[in-house]
Amino acid sequence: MGFFDFMTEDIAIDLGTANTLIIHNDKVVIDSPSIVARDRVSGKIIAVGKEANMMQGKTHENIKTIRPLKDGVIADFDASEKMISMLIKSIPALNKRLFTPALRMVVCIPSGITEVEMRAVKESCERVNGKEVYLIHEPMAAAIGIGIDIMQPKGNMIVDIGGGTTEIAVIALGGIVCDKSVKIAGDVFTNDIVYYMRTQHNLFVGESTAEKIKIQVGAAIEDLETPPEDMSVQGRDLLTGKPKQVAVSYREIAKALDKSIQRIEDAVMETLSQTPPELAADIYNTGIYLAGGGSMLRGLDKRISQKTDLPVYIAEDPLRAVVRGTGMALKNLVKFKSVLIK
């Protein structure tokens, strides 16, 4: 235990397109939307996370809300760095310190990420005082978080449906054997709902409202055993310009999301078709694991199961599976050395 260790804090970050989660001392200390609000005149960041999220779609011309990450990678370097820095500073246990501690971090990244994008993540972390920064691929982190022993010579298939990307991977012996990353996930579902409301109901709804619709009545199939109640949605009537309200059922949302879900199914099928036969035999027995917020879409597990003829399981607390895995990798750096990218 050197002096450096005493001054170092360990944190695990799931830098997501929709939400950023941070683990410190084995607890999720930050779980907030990946969004910042910037003052256009001074260029200052005035709010981040939940506070900025409440401003979304309600700002005047001097304030702009930005989502620094797009499709799982950093789109706005400056905003993402400020966001990470402000979120880390708001961790209660680190606030009390007299000076800023050096950080040892494990950050998860999408599997389809390029070298340049990877460097952007690393640099962002180094600028907020990250002395040791390790990266881990999202499907790998999800597998560890679900509780799969990834070091075994046994194939497991993970489908992680996040905000920006859906990561599909077959994992064995602590490595990714075949993977596919498609840019269809929670955000696309939200946009599908906005488009559906416009075209079918002549109702203009904002992103936040569409997000609520997705959570309350979102579905992947049109015949659920326990259907949610219809939801009343308020927005602007495109014909009259007046605010109006319509009722939306889960069947409509299932229709709205059908095409996007089909593309996720196709990606799953494609990954299965690239899987070596021995691992395919394992997957036939173990099934497919779903993680990420998108996996909470009602009936999605059933739909993928019907398409693949395989059992499909949803991780417990799927929203936090990835950050849990990232935190476990941080705790056992030696054990998971082979899956971490230095």
Language model segments and positions:
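Nucleotide/phosphate-binding catalytic cleft detector across ATP-hydrolyzing
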Residues: M1-I161, A169-I288, S295-K342
